[in-house]
Amino acid sequence: MAGASIEATLELWASSLRNVKARLRPLFRQERVAASAWKFLDGLLGNEPRKTGWMRAEAAGDPGPWRQQAILGRGWWDAEALRDIVGDYALETLADEEAVLVIDETGFLKQGKASCGVARQYTGSAGKITNCQIGVFASYVSRHGHAFIDRALYLPQAWTDDPERMTAAHVPDDVSFATKPQIARRMIARTIAAKVPFSFVAADSVYGTGELETALRKAGKGYVLGVAANHVFHSWGKKQMVRGSAATIARNIPKSAWRRLSAGDGTKGARLHDWAYLELADLDAGEYNSTLTGKWTRGLLIRRNIADGDLAFFSTWCPQNTPMKKLVSVEGHRWAIEDSFETAKNELGLDHNETRSWHGWHRHVSLVMLAFAMMAVIRHRANITSSPKKTTLRLRITHRS
């Protein structure tokens, strides 16, 4: 087929929606509750700009928002099971051995103090300290597309140290304080335990060093992890000895060592920066896991903004002789999760959750993840049938199940 026709695209949408609704059904004991969940999903995928309970209810033909609200609050179903359904569904289409698992967070701006996990804290979504919730996410990024496969609500210690507040927000008894890097390690461990294929992890400096690095080395996974300018690196077993903070090392890099490379294509074309890469040590993989063999290289990757010279630093771990261009590409995969947050908020109502409970947050976010995964699957399947001359399909279709 030279290109996906409108009719074929509409049928792909309809069949995909039937597929994901069928996967949802086992989560619910009663058909009527499942039907409400299906309508909730319809509302997320619809054209209404605000995905509030009233808006979703109006689109579903319900007399009021209580059925939509019950799905997130009063109903009995397992959001963790839905998370696993989302991952399985997305990976059926997106799985690739060279995929990158990207860890990042996003903020959910809030008013008041009752919403689970809300606090005055920094969020890049607002670019400042403000009243918000923070969600940590794992996105699976491959040549076939990208989708969220895990999520968790971050609870500040002011919350976990307040039993009454935790009870009021219906936080499970076994949930205790965890740093964002600890949340990330749990997500990565779940992904590895599920035998999800991927070769690298990418994350910013919130998650970048210490126990996460060790865990990934033991798992035989490469990484490109952001670090602060004052993070100390040193080399051993190399001809060129290096020791000092990342910023100090960068000042001593000769001009000839910098290369202008693209970290991938963005909305305005190639995302070009200047890059430098220092190999610091070659180590036996067996030092971390007796079942692994071969040499792996620990390194420092530096990115320099072409316009203003601003520097960013990354700790790297990769098979020996991995080219710098590969590490730059891995770091560039982080753009996909930023794009995912924007799309999920603007089109699917990721940040339109009106509930205040722990379960409500995870249920709402998991349903949005399912909607996003469905769009990723449709986009991939539609575009592989499209002519190279055609514009990449952007799916926002009024649907009927």
Residue ranges and their predicted role:
Residues 1-32, 44, 155, 170-176, ...:
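A short, flexible helix-boundary coil/loop motif
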Residues 2-202, 206-225, 229-232, 239, ...:
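Conserved, well-structured functional cores that handle cations and Mg-NTP chemistry
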Residues 35-38, 54, 132, 312, ...:
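Non-catalytic, well-ordered alpha-helical scaffold segments
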Residues 40, 308-335:
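Extended, non-catalytic structural segments that build the interaction scaffolds
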Residues 64, 306-311, 318-323, 344-353:
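Short acidic (Asp/Glu) and glycine-rich catalytic loops that position anionic groups and cofactors
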Residues 217-218, 331-332, 387:
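Short, solvent-exposed amphipathic alpha-helical segments in soluble enzyme
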Residues 326, 337-343, 380-382:
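Extended hydrophobic-aromatic, low-complexity segments
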Residues 335-342, 368, 372:
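Feature representing long, continuous alpha-helical segments
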